[in-house]
């Protein structure tokens, strides 16, 4: 991935496109790579990632079985928030990832992921305190899916109240949604994982 569509390419060590199986039903979308992610080229490998792994287990999911990515694929300098023009420049990558992976459930972590994904699905974004733990139906990139909005794990590291809300969202709401899509009646995934792996890699080469 040698993208130069926004200024963030000037600061990155490695782009962090995302990782995980392409035949999964569940996609996790965070905000942007941090320092550790930039160094390793992998999403959620620092302290927030450790917490995410635990939260996923609370929802009945192992990290290895979900696809994990971010709204922007390169680290903003000093871990500042991504700017609107950086988010817009990077959005086609996320839309293509959704088109190829066809998740049934997207877990949006933090307000940037929540706002972008809800707007793409035709919903309004107000605030995390009002909307965390809510489930939204929608279509993104032609894929019918559900979005659950919750707090960013990094925000929960030093704030017990946020951590409590985040843990409840994963253990109750997200767990219930995961059980729902795993029921036999929800149907088999189509398409070969191998074919999608190839087209996703081709896409990032462009
Ligand atoms: N925070 C994010 O939003 N994404 C990462 O990949 C790591 C930390």
Question: For each of these PLM feature ranges, what is it?
Answer:
Residues 1-184, 198-205:
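A polyanion-binding, active-site-adjacent surface
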Residues 185-194:
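Intrinsically disordered, low-complexity regulatory segments in eukaryotic proteins
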